[in-house]
Every structure is written in structure tokens, then in C-alpha cells.
């Protein structure tokens, strides 16, 4: 490959110091083409610009490279077929559909049918994609981010979208407790307050952060699944009756615990949908969804786990879209309650788990082992030199004895009924028993499990709790919400000023190499402390019949049907 230095010099003109730094890192080989796309788009370099720079460096632009491996794909050859209804199986939402409070897969699948974000984090693309924001850029230290908005956008109720709507939306999402109740506080806590959101002009919004943050665009993207833009003054408690948003579809009907229908939004700013309508049917668990696909009662399963899905995973009758993902499970241990006040006990639990065995048995290989910290293969900043923790029963027993538990102990783990999690709970119980740890299981449905806050919550207050975490394009939420002293989801009650300081340093870093250095420190620190066990990373899976084309899922359970269609 030959580098075109003249073209590269031309493309450098007018670029910021940070943008030129990333170009330097690419040219020197310190930054891979894949990581250049991800980090370049994060700081606001457009997809066409990134592609042109890659082309000038030699080879293809790579700007459309998929971040997934797919058996079956989201696209197909031939002209799209217009018309018809696409039938989708989805997990039942655990509560009323409310973007301000949503925290479950079924709810967020519903929200993105009519709602849109400033930025789209597509698992099928490496670079962040403009949605309601056309462009974004940071100041020199990443403490202020400026977003240029798409103009001519109309909500599906006929009302124009303005900068005032964007400002109001993020002020609601970032309102701190106790007045604020947004689930987005897991993202915005310590990062953004309502006072930091400002309208600059009719098409520009500025975010002044509480501290510099190099990954902030992910915080206002589809990763922050409740952050759809709504009209100023929206009553979120009544959103389920309108599904007001700027997306390609608008609400046809919604029946709690049964399903929903959507029809094209005639005022949509983008390409119009091919479908006449979409129909979602809700299911309380995965087995009936698989049976519905096999019985031709639905065309698509929005998201599923590989456990118990061999009949569709191994059949040529179905298309399977497989996405690289940071979906994972977290086993929190209360660091303020005996015996988990001693990090040796927490480490002992971690050493009992057979991670490769769990990936093989529960994920059918559609995932990878994790290492007891929230940095995984999806993230460019992960320090891959840190050794992988493996099952070592002898080591676990040694740690327990040193901590004063030579005969083990008995405790209770709370968990939820969702995908493979009940089976994972059984695996953890069986593995821990090999070291003398007796774990009693308390497994409930998601409505009960997530229905309360600190003080009366099965997942936030249990001595041990096993919980699902959806995909994020950057690890910041995983680093802060469940682990920092003021984290909104700190079920482990992990309060450590050294860790809090490291997370602040990581968040503030704009440079990828600096992020990697700090990530390595965090990884090693968490391996020593082990407030949370991370068994594995899970690939995102969506299934459809062979007649379905144009699906655009994310591994956080969103399903975009803007360009979906059914071939004859």
C-alpha cells in the first residue's frame, strides 16, 4: 500500500490539534485502522473524512467496515420490496414505556421504534453515525462539547424539533436525585447537570461537563437508550400513549403485555420505510419466541441468547445476525457485608468459575471470557496484556483459609429470569461449591428484580446479585455506575478513592494511548479488589426468516426497521 502524502497534507488542513494527533498515530502505526475509525468519529471527524484519510494512507477507506461477524446479513442483493407487515417477537417490557425510566430490554426495543438520538452507535459500523446531530466537536480538554443539529426535523405529532427540545430533553435526563429519577443518571451522574446544557443558536447545543470526558459522544448516543429527543414539556409518564419521537415510524397501537403496532411516519426527515407496518408480539421468555419463529407466527426475534436456541442457530432456514458486543453479566458482592468485606473471599469466588466452560455451555461459543473488570475486546482502550484469571479451586480454598473460612461459608445470590441468567446462576453455584462455598439462589422476574431502589431492591441490596448489562460503545458507564462511590448502580457498595480517581483520569483522557495506560491500572486494581465478577462477554444475536432483509439491530436490544423489507 502506498501513502499519498500530498492528499494527506491536504486533508490535514483545518483539522484541530487533536484530530491531527490521531492522524499522526495512524500514520506511525500506533493506531489501527479500526481504532482510528472509532476514536476519530468519537471526537467528531466525519465518516467521509475518516474514509478519505484511510484511503490516503493506502488501501480501502474502511469507513463501512462491519464491527460484527454475521451469518446471514442485515442487507441483501436486489431491489427492496415495498409493502407488507413485519412481525417481530420481543421480550415483554417490565414496566410502562417511559424513556426517562427505561432499564429493560423490552422497553428500550419499543422506545427506538419511534425515537431517535443525537448519535447512532451502530454495531454494524465502526464509526459513530450522525442521527439528529450532524456533527460534534470538543474543546481542547474535552470539558465542553458542541453539537450541530439536523434541521428540518419534525416530531411524529407534527411539531418541529428545535434546539430547545434537545436542551430540555437532556436537562430532564441529567436532573440529579432526589428530584431527578432518570435511569440515564447511571450515565450522567458526575458528568452532566441541567445547568451544563445550553442552546447556542437555533441549530447548536453546547454541553459543559463537570469534568473533561473523552468519550462523551457515546453518552448522548443510542448507547444511552432513554436519551431519545422529545418535545419540550413532554409528560414522560404519559409517553406510552403517544410514542412521540422523530423516527421513521409512529405508534399504531400499544397493548401492555400483549404487543404493539407501528406505521410509517409521513413527516420523517430520512428515507421512508419500505414496510406498510410493523407488529410486535411480546413474550415472557425465550422458548416461545423460538417456537413462534419456527411456526411462522413471527418473522424476526429482536434479540435472543444462544442457550436453548440451537434449533435456529444451526438451521439454514434462518438468518442470524451476530454482533460484537460488550453485553455481559455482573456478579456483585457486598463489600460492606461479611464475608465479602475481605477481598480474599471475593477473589476466591472469582477463582472458582470455569469461564471457558460457561461460554461453551451457555453461549454456544457466541461470546468470550471476561476478566473481572469492565474492559473487553470491543474497546480500543482495553489493556490486553493483563493476564486472564482462570479457574483455580486450590487457589480459592487457599484464599478462603487465609481469610478465616477454611470450611467455606453459606450465602445467598439474587438473580433474574432473563435469557441464560438462571442457568448461569446454577453454574456459579456449582462451581463455588467445589471450594466449599454454598450459594442459595433467589431468582425472580425482572419486574420484581428491578422494581425497587436502594434499600428494598433484590439486585441493589442483595449480599450477592447477578445482573445483566447491555452493550455500550465506551466502558464509562460500566466503570462508574456499579463501581464508583456515588455510582447509581453500586450494588457491591464498593467505595474506594483510589479507584474513583483512576476512573476520573480515564474519563478525562482524549488520547487513546493515555486511555490504555489508565485502563491497565484499573484492570489490575479491580483484579486485586474483585468487588464484581465478570464471567463473560456476550455477542448480540438477532434472528429472522430468510425472506427478511435490511434489519439494523444493536446488541443493546434496539431494532431499527427503517429499511427492513420482506422479499417474495
Listing of model-derived features with the role each one plays in the protein:
Residues 122-124, 213, 220-273, 277, ...:
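Gly/Pro-rich hinge or "lid" segments in bacterial periplasmic/extracellular proteins
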Residues 439-450, 477-546, 568:
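Extracytoplasmic/peripheral linker and loop segments enriched in polar/acidic and small residues
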Amino acid at each position: 500500500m502506498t501513502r499519498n502524502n500530498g492528499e494527506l497534507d491536504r486533508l490535514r488542513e483545518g483539522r484541530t490539534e487533536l484530530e491531527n494527533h490521531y492522524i499522526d498515530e495512524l500514520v506511525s502505526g500506533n493506531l489501527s485502522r479500526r481504532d482510528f475509525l472509532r476514536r476519530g468519529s468519537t471526537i467528531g471527524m466525519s465518516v467521509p473524512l475518516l474514509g478519505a484519510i484511510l484511503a490516503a494512507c493506502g488501501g480501502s477507506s474502511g469507513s463501512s467496515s462491519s464491527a460484527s461477524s454475521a451469518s446471514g446479513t442485515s442487507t441483501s442483493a436486489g431491489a427492496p420490496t415495498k409493502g407488507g407487515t413485519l412481525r417481530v417477537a420481543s421480550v415483554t417490557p417490565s414496566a410502562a414505556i417511559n424513556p426517562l425510566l427505561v432499564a429493560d430490554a423490552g422497553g428500550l426495543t419499543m422506545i427506538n421504534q419511534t425515537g431517535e438520538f443525537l448519535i447512532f452507535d451502530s454495531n454494524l459500523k465502526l464509526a459513530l453515525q450522525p442521527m439528529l446531530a450532524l456533527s460534534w466537536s470538543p474543546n481542547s480538554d474535552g470539558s465542553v462539547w458542541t453539537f450541530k443539529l439536523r434541521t428540518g426535523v419534525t416530531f411524529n405529532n407534527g411539531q418541529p424539533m428545535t434546539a430547545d427540545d434537545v436542551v430540555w430533553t437532556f436537562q430532564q435526563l441529567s436532573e440529579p436525585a432526589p428530584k431527578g429519577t432518570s435511569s440515564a443518571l447511571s450515565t450522567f451522574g458526575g458528568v452532566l447537570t441541567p445547568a451544563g446544557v445550553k442552546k447556542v443558536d437555533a441549530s447548536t447545543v453546547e454541553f459543559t461537563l463537570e469534568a473533561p470526558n473523552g468519550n462523551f459522544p457515546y453518552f448522548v448516543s443510542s448507547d444511552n437508550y432513554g436519551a431519545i429527543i422529545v418535545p419540550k414539556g413532554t409528560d414522560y409518564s404519559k409517553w406510552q400513549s403517544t410514542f412521540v419521537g422523530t423516527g421513521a415510524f409512529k405508534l399504531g397501537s400499544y397493548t401492555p403485555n400483549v404487543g404493539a403496532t407501528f406505521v410509517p411516519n409521513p413527516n420523517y426527515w430520512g428515507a421512508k420505510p419500505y414496510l406498510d407496518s410493523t407488529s410486535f408480539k411480546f413474550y415472557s421468555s425465550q422458548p416461545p419466541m423460538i417456537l413462534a419463529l419456527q411456526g411462522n407466527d413471527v418473522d424476526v426475534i429482536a434479540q435472543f441468547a444462544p442457550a436453548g436456541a440451537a434449533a435456529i442457530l444451526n438451521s439454514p432456514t434462518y438468518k442470524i445476525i451476530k454482533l460484537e458486543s460488550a453485553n455481559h453479566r455482573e456478579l456483585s458482592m457486598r463489600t460492606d457485608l461479611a464475608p465479602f468485606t475481605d477481598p480474599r473471599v471475593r477473589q476466591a469466588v472469582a477463582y472458582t468459575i470455569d469461564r471457558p466452560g460457561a461460554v461453551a455451555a451457555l453461549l454456544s461459543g457466541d461470546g468470550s471470557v471476561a476478566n473481572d473488570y469492565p474492559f473487553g475486546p470491543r474497546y480500543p482502550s482495553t489493556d490486553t496484556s493483563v493476564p486472564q484469571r482462570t479457574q483455580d479451586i486450590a487457589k480459592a480454598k487457599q484464599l478462603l483459609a487465609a481469610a478465616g473460612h477454611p470450611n467455606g461459608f453459606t450465602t445467598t445470590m439474587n438473580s433474574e429470569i432473563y435469557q441464560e441468567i438462571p442457568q448461569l446462576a446454577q453454574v456459579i453455584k456449582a462451581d463455588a461449591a467445589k471450594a466449599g462455598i454454598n450459594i442459595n439462589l433467589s431468582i425472580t422476574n425482572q419486574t420484581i428484580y428491578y422494581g425497587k431502589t436502594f434499600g428494598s431492591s433484590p439486585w441493589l441490596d442483595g449480599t450477592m446479585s447477578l445482573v445483566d448489562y447491555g452493550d455500550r460503545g465506551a466502558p464509562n458507564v460500566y466503570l462508574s455506575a456499579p463501581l464508583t462511590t456515588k455510582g447509581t448502580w453500586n450494588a457491591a457498595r464498593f467505595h474506594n478513592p483510589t479507584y474513583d480517581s483512576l476512573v476520573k483520569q480515564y474519563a478525562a483522557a482524549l488520547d487513546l494511548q493515555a486511555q490504555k495506560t489508565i485502563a491497565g491500572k484499573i484492570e489490575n486494581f479491580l483484579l486485586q479488589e474483585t468487588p464484581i465478577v465478570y464471567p463473560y462477554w456476550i455477542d448480540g444475536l438477532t434472528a429472522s426468516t430468510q425472506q427478511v432483509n435490511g434489519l439494523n439491530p444493536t446488541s443493546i436490544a434496539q431494532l431499527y426497521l427503517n429499511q427492513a423489507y420482506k422479499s417474495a
